[in-house]
Amino acid sequence: MALTLKAMEYFTTALRHGNIAKAAVELNIAASAISSAIDQVETEFDLTLVTRQRARGIQANASGREVARKCERLLEEYQSVLNEGAELRHALSGTLRIGYYAPIAPAFLPPI
């Protein structure tokens, strides 16, 4: 199974909060979805990336911090691509055609 952007977002949000429940509230989803995303990321890398403790929440180990850092960078780049695409949609494009009335054109246009 391939790692999804959504799983990366859930994983990094959970680590940023240090708590699955708080991440679930921020993302407006069930805590079980966050937990499943963390499992998916760990399965994809075949590593244990976080330590889960009921009283303390979750903490990333060294591998988890590295994966989270790279996931955050990838998510930021993805958002940047989306923003640039939106800007391109609103950019001017096409051919500009200029018409003129020949008898008065010399008064307004530079000589060629």
PLM features: residue spans?
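A short LG(V/I)-centered, amphipathic sequence patch enriched
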Residues: 42-60
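The N-cap/first-turn positions of alpha helices
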Residues: 4-7, 31, 64
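Residues within the DNA-recognition helix of helix-turn-helix
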Residues: 30, 36-40, 112
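Short helix-boundary/capping micro-motifs
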Residues: 13-30
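Short alpha-helical "packing" element that flanks the helix-turn-helix/winged-helix DNA-binding module
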Residues: 10-14, 67
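Residue cluster at the C-terminal edge of the helix-turn-helix DNA-binding motif
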Residues: 17, 26, 40-48
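Alpha-helical linker/hinge and terminal dimerization helices associated
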Residues: 44-45, 67-89
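N-terminal winged-helix
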Residues: 32, 83, 89-112
